[in-house]
Curated annotation (Swiss-Prot):
Species this chain originates from: Rattus norvegicus
Main localization (coarse): nucleus
The protein's name: Scaffold attachment factor B1
Region annotated Interaction with POLR2A, chain positions: 550-816
Organism phylogeny: Eukaryota, Metazoa, Chordata, Craniata, Vertebrata
A Pfam family this chain is assigned to: RRM_1
Amino acid sequence: MAETLSGLGDSGAASAAAVSSAASETGTRRLSDLRVIDLRAELRKRNLTSSGNKSVLMERLKKAIEEEGGNPDEIEVISEGNKKMPKRPSKGKKPEDEGVEDNGLEENSGDGQEDVETSLENLQDMDMMDISVLDEADIDNGSVADCVEEEEEATLPEGLGLLRIGRLQSKGLPEQLQELAIDDKEAINNVDTSSSDFTILQEMEEASLEPENEKILDILGETCKSEPVKEEGSELEQPFAQATSSVGPDRKLAEEEDLFESCGHPEEEEEEEEEEEQEEEQEEEGDLALASSSKSESSSTRCQWSEADALLAVVKREPAEAPGGGTGMDREPVGLEEPVEQSSTAAQLPETTSQELVRAPTAAPSPEPRDSKDDVKKFAFDACNDVPAAPKESSASEGADQKMSSVEDDSDTKRLSREEKGRSSCGRNFWVSGLSSTTRATDLKNLFSRYGKVVGAKVVTNARSPGARCYGFVTMSTAEEATKCINHLHKTELHGKMISVEKAKSEPAGKRVPDRRDGDSKKEKTSTSDRSANLKREEKGDRKDDAKKTDDGSTEKSKDADDQKPGPSERSRTTKSGSRGTERTVVMDKSKGVPVISVKTSGSKERASKSQDRKSVSREKRSVVSFDKVKESRKSRDSESRRERERERSEREQRLQAQWEREERERLEIARERLAFHRHRLERERMERERLERERMHVEQERRREQERIHREREELRRQQELRYEQERRPAVRRPYEVDGRRDDAYWPEAKRAALDDRYHSDFSRQDRFHDFDHRDRGRYPNHSVDRREGSRSMMGDREGQHYPERHGGPERHGRDSRDGWGYGSNKRLSEGRGLPLLPRRDWGEHARRLEDDRAWQGTADGGMMERDQQRWQGGERSMSGHSGPGHMMNRGGMSGRGSFAPGGASRRHVIPRGGMQAGFGGTEPGQQTQ
């Protein structure tokens, strides 16, 4: 605040002293206990230069008091008892003996020497402690401004309001205007001057708006009702044309915003330095332009502050309200030369009203608002015609002429000192991040004092976030010491935490303007120079002419402003005073239908426009990505690339898996086909084997059938051979009996024949008779036959009644049947089931020979028997001598001859007994035969 008041002209020094004595109590303090702001106030009261550091100011004030004959150790100064002191140090109260602050959030530790920075730099330092730097530039420009505390916001406008009240009282203004100033102060206290919000509480607005409007209407005698004016900062872009004291809270807020941006973004501080340098140049030109202003300019300052607050609220597009009409009249520099001059300005305007109404339509942004605003302006000016005028204009011009040179010298000295300090402090500051919550500024001072002289050490945090991280801002005496501290203490441990020491890229108290604003600054310089020249010329003219020029100039400026940056349709055209930098605006409230007149200074609009420009610049700066955001974006890109790689890898794996599954399916299909082929082949082989087995079985059956057929053929052949042999044998056996005709002889009686038949059949019915026959028993037969021959003669008579023994059959005994039985013919053997077993072919001949032998033996046996019987029957009636005859011998020979045939099997033709028998018969005499 000291810096904002450092440019006050010497013309306002006496009034400032009067205001301070009237508004607050006076106390006695030692010179060494005075603050820089108190020292400068005392110097300004004595019309001395108030620039420089504290030691220079103390020396200068001490000399002045000694020249006046006072005691330098006991100085009567204003003790502002009703002023609310902030909890944190403001810009002008950075005490040298205060090492650690009470709030615990920020601290300031010096090296025992008073800070040599100006009050503006103190303001920036205070703002810097109100913010929190979250990893360099992590906070955007809009949120950084939230670090300002409400106590400080309320303190500065309140103190400035007291100063305005004192100045009004020193000029003897009416009581109504003093009350209005008090109300204005209360309204300002209710304004939230945070550089990010600039919001006004609605209840405070309504409470302060109504009384102020009524008082202004009473003073001015108007029928117009004051309403809040909402204007774009772009419409209000005009250079400074007012006293240095009129910079007030608007300048402070703008600088606070610059400081917030520089603390949040250290790399942007150089641009802000250029901007501040440009403002200083404009301020100097404004001092020249206000050289002819009145001594009561402090009243205009009060009005401009309240208007500037309203403008700042409008810039943020919040529903901020301010006493527009009343402040417009109060802020009119023409009417502030004397208490009654304020209302007389409106009475001087009717002459120029017609010119304003003619020129004003060309500056309107659109046809419809232009017509309505013309009507409103005409109505407002006509309603203000009855206000009386006051003749107090020359005093302000004289006072301004006397103090113009001192203001120029003061501004030059101030600018040079700032430039020198800006150059000397370049590269000395650095940030310390990663601090513990228990780290204090004294700890930082003790730590960095090992490597050089520590000019200042501060611990900052976000006051609105209780748990925010702490950062340190340290200023060394030289850039080399700062570099040494960075090299030695970067990445070291302090209070158990790793700290990072990084050099500040630009100084927070810089004065440079960004390159993109150089063109605007040059234009503002040119326009300010033109207005300064116009002011000097117009001060020599008449007041009415001055009023006309004011109206003309304001109309032209309104045209330029509307052409460059047109506002909304509800904005009214503005008329600017080139001589005093004022602007009169008439608007129509569409909701109430009441015209509103507002007079504003161009300086406040210039500050508002600069604030708007700063906001636009800050919005542009918000687009600048901080290191953390870059790191975060890089991490996000890395994570995205990792996810992309993971997705590609998963897709590739899925493709490989699908390909593997497809190949596996193909392999399985091929294997299934191969198995099916093998199965078909095995099936075919099995069927082939079955077919071959069937064929083999068929061939076997054929072979078996063939063997059976061959066997049957062999059997048939054998049977045929047997039949043939049998047929060949039968005629030879039957021939003797057929030749013999004795059957028909009467020798054989029928009865006897039958009996013999019976005996024969019964005797030979036994099948095993042949087998029981023993050839060794043949010896019995001769005896038997002899016996029979012996008894035959005696028994001849009884022969008819006798029967032959069973073993001697009759002639029929030797029949066919008997032969069959004795010979075991083939028919009999087959019928009895006693056939010979099948013999192999190789045994057939031997069997046939054996069979022939058996048959030959049987034949001989039969032949012998028959011959013996025949001899018995034939020689039964002869004598015994007959037995010894040839017949007996033949019989014996026949019997012996039976076993004398060759083994090869002689036929019956070779049997000798037959011939013997025939020879026997042939040797018989005919007589004996007949007998």
